[in-house]
Amino acid sequence: MSDLSKIPLLAQALVACRLCRRAVLAMLAETDQQLALGVCDVIESMTKIAGKTIDRDSSKVVLSRIHRTRSNQAALQSLHWALEAVVAAHRPSALYGDEPATVAAMRCIESVSDDPRISALQIAIVVESDIDLLAFACDEDGIQLSDSLSDHVFKRLPPCHALTLGEPRRNPEDDYR
């Protein structure tokens, strides 16, 4: 995911949001899916507006209504970090070091990657393809680091499908217990 920092900040938040959407479709029950997908829609709409102060509390209230279980924890945690990424992207840091939006987007990716039912290769493929598509579309549209994303960028993106959940990865240490 080294290319993540090379795309605009709101595009980074969109990468995180799209991964969340895939995780939500795979991990949440249908009733909870609608609430979580609503938060994803809010995050996506916030990537189309640059320089606004974002109220994340209403989205956090919606997320708090969803009962956390082992099977949906990664999706809910990733939604939290995607929300943080878009909020951070709206107030870029003037300090040196890692950009808060990039850090939050990476934490979003890590939280989904921590689920043992999801292949690391699957995560790498969907995230890197989103980064490549967004980098091309942003470059084509002349979008800079802290610019909002245009409709042109969104038209370049394919729809998100659910991640494929498999059997939890086997830990070789468990064989010796």
Where are these regions (language model features)?
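Structured binding/interaction patches within domain cores
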Residues: 2-154, 159, 163-164, 176
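Signal-transducing coiled-coil linker helices
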Residues: 167-168
